[in-house]
Amino acid sequence: MSTRRKLTRAEKKAIEGAISRAKKTDKKQKSAQDSIPYIRMTVDGICQVTQTHFTKMIQFRDINYQLSDNEDKQSIFDGWCDFLNYFDSSVKFQLSFINLTASEETFAQTISIPPQEDGFNSIRDEYTRMLQNQLSKGNNGIVKTKYLTFGIDADNIRVAKTRLERIETDIINNFKRLGVAAEVLNGHDRLKVLHDILRMDSLEPFNFSWDWLPRTGLSTKDFIAPSSFLFNRAKDFRMGKKFCSVSFLQILAPELSDRVLKDFLDIESNIVVNLHVQSVDQVSAIKTIKRTITDLDKSKIEEQKKAVRAGYDMDIIPSDLATYGAEAKKLLADLQSRNQRMFLVTFLILNTADTKRQLDNNIFQTNSIAQKYNCNITTLDYQQEEGMVSSLPLGLNQIEIQRGLTSSGVAIFVPFTTQELFQGHEGALYYGINALSNNLIMVDRKKLKNPNGLILGTPGSGKSFSAKREISNAFLVTDDDIFICDPEAEYQTLVERFNGQTIKLSPTGKGNDGKPCYLNPLDLNLDYSDEDNPLSLKSDFILSLCELIVGSKDGLAPVEKTVIDRCVRLIYQDYLNDPKPENMPILEDLYNALRKQEEKEAQFVATALEIYVSGSLNVFNHRTNEDINSRIVCYDIKELGKQLKKIGMLIVQDQVWNRVTINRAAHKSTRYYIDEFHLLLKEEQTASYSIEIWKRFRKWGGIPTGITQNVKALLSSREVENIFENSDFIYMLNQAAGDRKILAQHLGISPHQLSYVTHSNEGEGLLFYGDTIVPFVDQFPKNTELYRLMTTKPDEQKEVK
């Protein structure tokens, strides 16, 4: 026997509200539900609009049209024409562009950082205020969505379902060819879209379950209908508390710009734009145009006869007649030989506002945009209810004002502008403002297939600042552990503010406090590798270390690799048998094991190792004496000098890998920032090990970020190019001319996109997030504690100290 789940207070409130809207005060009076013209909505998203017309709905995302160069724009435009040509006369479709203001509370929750009991809430509050300030610069308060609703006529829903699903598959595939992400909406999703339009005066979220219908006797309309409709005026109407007006676009210009639709959708108020499109049967269209040409030719002959009778030149005919004749012949040629179809289009705009004056201002603004392109906006006098119905994404057009356009004429209303990167969930971090739309860029690298990242830029472009901003944001928002390899001692101030550890490595072995500070490069965590034997990956690391130590131009010889690998397995035997700290080997154990080998190559490597064991560079010949337990740890290797810096970076990388393996068991992410990353990629074996670690990080919950100004080093070999291929996140700041050329070729950056990293200001560039490319600007407010902690400018750093 099944037990029914108890309704929550919010669910009860939603049902009570629906019941109150369902009650009629007068049997003769229409209810708000009566103005919503569909018969039923099914769970899988099929809407029966009339007895014989059925529709489905697809939401599609944006792509970077405005950011593309002319060649790419033409390619997108041609692809959109092909997309439109798919629809024959049996399939009506509707393009809906819905811009609705989200409640301030909703957006505040999205960007605010929840407090924690760790002593850093003052910085969280400051960061939240910064985000709110950046939010106000754009129109992130407006949620923009795009939909395609398509419908067919059928005898019943069973027949309609099969055909709609086939068309749906074709449309999704056609969107994929354009590089556009799209998904089909189910019944609940469609009802939510209708609810958001019809009840935009309400702050209550959409609350609905199919289970409630049989239990309450309500219909789906009762959960989406506004409190009332009032259609008692010629040019506007009331929908709940909102003042609304529907207008249509009169297309008067012979040619239109591809920016028309974009300009309408850039209006910073609630607006719903719809294009109802009906394909005309190709044979009928051609016949109609031929008939028109024949009629025009007859008129031309009549005019010529009149001219002869009147005694003037028969070639002088009315200019309109000549123009119409030329246009008709061009249209016929388009349909017959230029892959064009004929469409009938109705272009509707629904403006809404809180007051009548504000509504008039919105309509005036809309009309100004239309007039800029030699078009007119005309309100639907005494047809506001029909206009409202036609503005709902149901696939029903009750306005019989249509304009005939060819495929390219319809395609000029390009539905793509710029991609946005705004993920409204708690793990999303701030990366600046979209340079095209002024909207916040907030994303979570963990959502990428491969969260590994690169921060690239010339000196002074803001690389270190950008890294510090992400570090701070990640520390305040997530519980991730954060490690930094710091070759220039730039991160200590920030790390100390977050009560982190700075481990200073120097040739003398003295840390920040003057006490000995050692890291053992031979430290091994038994979970070091996926394999049963953790020594395999550790051996790769030690080979990389020895390659740096030997310093040969050609790397280690095969025999040298063999003897090192043999000795590695020998020196770890005691620890593997009894894994206690005192059994952990150090470099001296490796040195002694090499000395015992007979091969001359072993003696050669041992001799090279000697200075790091008993000579002046023996800082790494000790067991680790630092208890690394902070969430944020900085390895300051500035004082290691040229001889030890690369070795220090490699050892730090290995230490972080040990922490990654520990954190994986705790289901915790580990972020690792490597400044001057190119230094690890110059030697073949070291580069090979770094690339292997780079690949492994993702599987083990690691999020590495390489920071460098040297792009050429990143692309120095086919193997090193794997770093790019395994990095779905690239934060690209200003680039030198040579590097721009390399990056454009490798990442497929268009000349127009490249302009955003050409002589750009500090904190400006391109963000690559998966397949999305967005130009950004990050002007972090200087009057904040965080800015003073993150800046690398000496005069500004003095203020902190």
What are these regions (language model features)?
Residues 499-503, 719-732:
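A short helix-turn-beta junction within AAA+ P-loop NTPase domains corresponding to the substrate/partner-engaging
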Residues 2-418:
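Extended, folded cores of ATP/NTP-driven motor/assembly subunits in large transport
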Residues 466:
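Hydrophobic positions on the alpha1 helix immediately C-terminal to the Walker A/P-loop
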Residues 747-800:
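Conserved P-loop NTPase
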Residues 473-483:
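Post-Walker A helix-loop "phosphate-sensing" segment adjacent to the P-loop in P-loop NTPases
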Residues 63, 70-89, 96-100, 263-265, ...:
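P-loop NTPase motor domains
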Residues 463:
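Conserved lysine of the Walker
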